[in-house]
Amino acid sequence: MEPGSTVKPFTLLAALESGKFKPESVINTSPGRIKVSYKTFVDPHDYGRLDLAGILTKSSQVGTTKLALQLNPDTTRELFERMGFGESIGSGFPGETSGSLPSYRKWDPVTQSTFSFGYGISASALQLARAYSILASNGFRKEVSMVALDDAPESVAVIDPKLTGLIRTMLETAASDQGTGKRAMIDGYSVGGKTGTLHKVAATGGYDQHRYMSIFAGLSPVDQPRIVTIVVIDEPGIGDYFGGLVAAPVFSEVTGSALRLLQVPPPRLATKGRANPISRSRSSWSGGTC
């Protein structure tokens, strides 16, 4: 599957790692659209000036695109490679695939832009879970196992832990009342995560304008994560299809139940209540926005 906006945290991670941007760096997303060569990418609203956390919270295509175009394609791809995209996990699970991570030498500005928000790359839910587990484990990539292990799995440091902490904090805002993932909140636990909504590839090529995939990728608790959960809903029923409306509530229920089953003590009380559903406005980019 194409992971869509759930990989935006890794684009922000590449931006921070490059040294060209800081968390407080501001990107002007006005007027809510950007033309790159023959493509125009559009946000649901004109969000104006956004820092990096704001880009993630609003799931801004314009902000993400502007960041991506200022990065070297080879270093961006190399970071995704470190996160485990494009390679076999080695779980031994039947049917496991390595997904695809295209060579940066084939990228034009449009490809560089769409890659930054999860198009032109494919990954399994397990690969996405491993990538988020690197954020959860302070930059360490661990071996994947389908069964409980007596000894801790081997791990290797691939990302600066300070940067993974910054991204987790941004993900917490994205999964709050301010963000597209507000319905992923769990009473008593902090949650960090990112929504994804994308059109499915049509049998005739291009994207099908009437068939969707809704995703939520997240972790909890934010400060010391115990669980990473990936929710993928293939072609949700008639009505809502945004990841924040369809997949995020499933994350909340499943992850909350798992935390209680594991007897993880609530680190703090989560924000009470739920905010109003996110806007149904859609961008002219056929891949979806959040």
Residue map of PLM features:
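Beta-lactam-recognizing serine transpeptidase/beta-lactamase-like catalytic domain environment
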Residues: 1-4, 10-236, 243, 289-290
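Short, gly/Ser/Thr-rich active-site loops of penicillin-recognizing serine hydrolases
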Residues: 152-155, 168, 245-290
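Short beta-strands and strand-coil junctions in structured, solvent-facing domains, enriched
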Residues: 237-239, 260
